[in-house]
Design a protein with these regions (language model features):
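Tandem repeat scaffolds
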Residues: 1-146
């Protein structure tokens, strides 16, 4: 069962870093939330709103971020290994130093995102994935899927 807006407010006002592994945060409004260093491994964030959220060094291993909005989110150094980012909006997001190995990036939009130093080895994408201008897809070790 997803959290209500009131429950989220209480949760986010607690001590950091947050321990939210496996939590159902689907469709949650987390715009501008500070989730730095949070443990969100295996969490369901499908359809969540995380625009301008701070997720620096957060653990999002195997998290479901399908159809999530992460515009201008700060994901510097975050771990998104094996995360499902399909159909997510990452326009202008800071993914510098992030670990995106084996993540699903199909249909995602990373226009103007910062991928400097990001580990994308084994990540999957399709012809509908939008990359930042001048991003060298071949050199990143990503895998094209149909």
């Amino acid at each position: 069962m997803p959290y209500t807006k009131e429950e989220l407010a209480v949760l986010l006002s607690g001590s950091k870093p947050l321990q939210l592994a496996g939590c159902d945060l689907s469709k949650a409004d987390l715009n501008e939330a500070d989730l730095s260093k949070a443990n969100l491994s295996g969490a369901n964030l499908s359809g969540a709103f995380l625009d301008q959220a701070r997720l620096r060094y957060a653990d999002l291993t195997k998290a479901n971020l399908e159809d999530a909005s992460l515009r201008k989110a700060n994901l510097h150094g975050a771990t998104l290994a094996e995360a499902d980012l399909s159909d997510s909006d990452l326009r202008g997001a800071d993914l510098s130093g992030a670990k995106l190995n084996h993540a699903n990036l199909s249909f995602s939009n990373m226009t103007d995102a910062n991928l400097a130093g990001a580990d994308l080895q084994g990540a999957k994408y399709n012809r509908h994935t939008h990359w930042p201008a001048d991003f060298e897809v071949q050199a990143a070790g990503v895998i094209m899927v149909k």
